[in-house]
Amino acid sequence: VPKEVKVIGKNPIFVDESCNICQGTVLDASGGSIYIGPESVIGQSSIIGPAYVGELTQLKPYSTINNSYIGNNCRIGGEIDSSIILDYTNKSHFGYLGHSYVGEWVNIGANTTTSDLKMTYGTVSMKIGDEKKDTGITKLGSFFGDMSKTSIGTNIYCGMRIGISTHLYGNIANDVPSYVIYGQGIGSENAEMDVSSAIKFQKRMMSRRNINMSAHYEKMMKTIFDMTSKERKDYGVRPKRFTIR
């Protein structure tokens, strides 16, 4: 660990020699070990263990990572607490992500915040099928499917499930199925995401990591779209052009 980095605690800390870690970073291993992978770039940040930061991942200055797993080739900023973020996901800006699970290729817009605690301090319920189930957990954030995206200023209530390739705007107080553009939170009408558009958007995102979409990946996206069609129908969305009012 470079001498300019502040180290706290006695649990093991591993920083790959190819990592670029900035002066002023704090690594607090009091509560658990810390791993920082190859060719990662750590701006002036606080990392509180246990924590894992994968290879090629960039932490923006003044990020706070606590008790979390960050996958490979991610772009991370703001506050992350007790969460799992898989590969190629962007959360580059300020905003809070807590007690949540985030899939691959997700883009979380600036000032997006997940609630993970009810104002009543009661346990969080989730909808499973047609029923609401008490999780027995008092701190529970959201579950983001692969390729989902949030606009700036999105606020997501406790225990929400966000589908694959879904786009979110505004306040989210219920689950959102896959391939839905959710505009209800800003006064717009929800719409079904056209699968060809979703594939186009995903190809653009992959190109920013110098990755070409395989034919198998494209087929997978189409298959998931077909598999989740009933969910969208039951949700009341239909194919239409989405507009922001």
Regions found by a protein language model. Name each.
Residues 1-47, 53:
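Extended, small-residue-rich solenoid/repeat segments and analogous flexible loops
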Residues 5-6, 13-14, 37, 54, ...:
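A short linear-motif detector with a strong N-terminal bias
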Residues 18, 24, 39, 56, ...:
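Tight coil/turn sites that cap or link beta-strands
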Residues 22, 43, 60, 69-71:
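Transmembrane beta-barrel architecture of outer membranes
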Residues 61-62, 72-239:
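Glycine-rich hexapeptide-repeat left-handed beta-helix
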